[in-house]
Amino acid sequence: MRTIPPSELIINDDGSIFHLHLHPGQVAPTVILVGDPGRVAMVAEFFDSRECEVTNREFHTVTGTYRGKRMTVLSTGIGIGNIDISVTELDALVNVDFATRQEKSEKQRLTLVRLGTSGALQPDIRVGEFVFSRTSVGFDGLLNYYKGRNDVCDLAIEQAFMRHTGWNELLPKPYFIDADRTLFEPFRDTTRE
């Protein structure tokens, strides 16, 4: 197994990961990602119990239980760069042995749920209304650097979009990804299409 060098995995002197300041074991299998650190408290107030709370810069984390299920809520700050840092460090926390700096042979999958706010152009969507995104569109180009990018993207929509808009080839290639449909099931009776 490959040993991950300190230049690629920065571990603080206290054994926590560099940006999030979390230790292995402090991340639940389900992670709710919010942008604003102030929203962490709003979400965590619904927790039945809290086992840890860690803050470093814009990264504020609370891990606890909700209806008996262990969950983590984490603020990422603004922008895709911060989200990339957060998700990369979450993955390392559950899939890398910090003592040996080697990837664990058995990988743990995290369920990540992004919870945020957005403006709306449609007049029938009221302020404060609950909205699910069926598809995510990225213009930042970050996903283009990841292995398996084409396996998760809707390539036909991407090509149609670029043709329709006359997409400038000097810009990063946009990407379109459909949300996991199972996310909508619990809310089917309380939302509209």
Q: What annotation goes with each model-predicted range?
A:
Residues 193:
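Short catalytic/ligand-gating loop segments at beta-alpha or beta-beta junctions
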